[in-house]
Amino acid sequence: MDVPGPDSDWRSPAFRQKVVAQIEEAMRKAGTGHTKSSTEMESHVFTKAKTREEYLSMVARLIIHFRDIHKKAQGGPDPINALQNLPGGVPGVIGPRPPGAQMGGMGQMSMGPHAMQGVAGGQQGAGAAGPMQQMIQQQQQQQQQQQQQQSIQFQTFQPQQQQQATMQSQQPSAMFQQIRLQQLQQHHQNQQMQHQNQQQQQAQNQQQQNQLHQTRMQQQLQLQQLQQQQQQQLHQQQVHAQAQAQAQAQAQAQAQAQAQAQAQAQAQAQAQAQAQAQAQAQAQAQAQSIQQMQQQQQLQVQAQGQPQVQGQGGAVQMPPHSQQQQVLVPQMVQGQHSQMSALSQQQQLKLQQAMQARMQQQQQQQQQQQQQQQQQQQQQQQQQQQQQQQQQQHQQQQVQQVQQASQLTAVPGQMMPRPGMQIPPRLPRATPNSAIPQNPVAIGGQQMPQAQQMMSSPSPVQVQTPQSMPPPPQPQPSPQPPSSQPNSVSSGPTPSPGGFQPSPSPQPSQSPASSRTPQSYPLQVPSPGPLNTPGNPSSVMSPAGASQSEDQLYMDKLRQLSKYIEPLRRMINKIDKNEDRKKDLSKMKSLLNILTDPNTRCPLKTLQKCEIALEKLKNDMAVPTPPPPPVPCTKKQYLCQPILDAVLANIRSPVFNHSLYRTFAPAMTAIHGPQITGPSIPSRKRKLEDDERQAIPNILQGEVARLNSKFLVNLDPSFCSNNGMVHLICKLDDKNLPSVPPLQLSIPADYPDQSPHWEDDGQQYEANPFLRTVHKNMTSKLLQLPDKHSVTALLNTWAQSVRQACLSA
């Protein structure tokens, strides 16, 4: 039979049809009539079988039964009954088989050339397909074959002759079936060995594949880590590059600013040089105009005596002496001419002196200007050095920021600050207050009474204006006035013979102080004083001065409202669990937050509204009336004033007495000793006669009764106790101590509130040194007792003094 496929294929219709065809062929070869068809027989076997092996074994037995019928050519019993009554003792037919063994003798049936070979081949194919399933099926097959011998019986009674006939018919083929079974077992064992080897190879292959897969996964993880590291390095490089680019851009901007500052300084130096040249030219022009005026005066004087032709004296610049010689020698008149020449000489001398003084002043001014320029250059160099230092610090800060950013980027998942969002710290501006007072122009500009017009920051050339200059004798317009200089850079007024007038074409220019500052200021300012610089306190209004009064009012109001803090807290605790007043609770909490939290600041108007709301809630909160404001005491505060204040504040507290006792009782006990209490007073009432006769207090009687037997106490008969005081005589009767004089005690009427008194009689203890020692010890030990002590304590002290004297002796 051809049995392809796994264990579940034996239930398929195709497989069952093949089995029906084989049964039909066996029935046809048997040649005898049967009551049932091959399909019915196969369906009966199919319903009885539970596994493939059981199904095949039952079909094989059925086919063997038909073959035996064919051999005997006799009518046998019903094949179904024969199938049910086959004995199980025949080896190799129904009995238990070893694992992997198949039905023997199936290859010998005349069912076709490839009938039973197909069964074996199908089983081999099935074994090759599932070796693990074959092992399980073989184990199940043994159990099922044992059960088949007992369970598969359709009819329990059959003739013994038929059974014997079938046994005899089956015996010839039993030996051959055993041989065939052994061959099949060996073949099946070989197949199992091959399958085991294949399984081992497959397991090894799977292990190798798993190892390869693991190595691939590790390689992929390493590649991902390398990619992440490369990305982080690229990002860090980009951050570094951006930071370096920013630093370079800032350095370039600073270099450009320095170059501009140097260019401005050079331009200012050129302007100053031009101004000096202009000043010299103006001085020369003034000298020429003065000479021309002198010549005109001389010509006028000469014209009065003798008419002469006037030459162009202003065109030639010659000394006054040579001009006098050229004009006065050929045209001299007696009397008037000599006087006029003398006057002209005096005027010339004065003019020469004035010119010399003017030249000296100009030289001094030039020297001062040069010194100022040198100072300005030094200041510029210092500022450049400071800027370089600031640049270096700024670059260091940027490098630190870049390092921090790189550290942040090294951790995945964190937010990385964008380099473009970083605002570089502004360089501290050079305070122009240090440079403006050094500029003489600014000081001069503020002190000039004539310059009332608005002008730009004046240049150092304006220092010439406030100086005094002797006016010419006759202020007349000169024939050659100083023309307007278009190339003049001076912004201040230039001196002219006609008075101090500004130049016709003043051009505003920046002063050195303004060029040094990195911030450009508005041009039209009256003086450098009100410039809005950080260092000028007059230009920037202090916010502290403006809000000082408001802060003071706010703090005073907050101090006034501090009395509502505790009542407000009690009110909040009271309505905290009341759900109906949640809104009021939130408002009260906000009010309490405003009053208690110093960081919470609200406007003064809001605080006033809070005061109104608290006044409305005053009755509900039961705010205590504030005490009158304390009078400022200039005297020294009393030492115990804090304790008195605390007592006054807590005097009405129900636990105040307990707190005082708990606080001060240990100290009072250490100072005054333990409280002396007498025995409890009996409940029964004494008779009046007993009270009148009783002269000694009960406390004292009880204490004397409890004394040690070594103390003998008696009343002193020499004293009467009319005033309530009790006098006692105490003796020491101790076998271990020597005899000493008795002790006389006086107990006050209010004992134990007052301590007993020892009536010291020094004469009794002056008899010998031993008694003097006892007296000394007694006196010193009494000082160590508390101010309130009992009779027992006093007597014990006396005994200790005697014992101490004995030890010292």
Curated annotation (Swiss-Prot):
InterPro entries from the UniProt entry: KIX_dom_sf, Med15_C, Med15_central, Med15_N
Leader sequence residues: none
Name of the protein this chain belongs to: Mediator of RNA polymerase II transcription subunit 15
Residue stretches of biased makeup (Low complexity): 446-467, 485-502, 510-520
Principal localisation: cytoplasm
Keyword annotations from UniProtKB, A to Z: Activator, Cytoplasm, Nucleus, Transcription, Transcription regulation
Record keyword Cell membrane present: no
Record's function text: Component of the Mediator complex, a coactivator involved in the regulated transcription of nearly all RNA polymerase II-dependent genes. Mediator functions as a bridge to convey information from gene-specific regulatory proteins to the basal RNA polymerase II transcription machinery. Mediator is recruited to promoters by direct interactions with regulatory proteins and serves as a scaffold for the assembly of a functional preinitiation complex with RNA polymerase II and the general transcription factors. Required for cholesterol-dependent gene regulation.
GO annotation, biological process: regulation of DNA-templated transcription
Subcellular location: Cytoplasm; Nucleus
Organism: Danio rerio
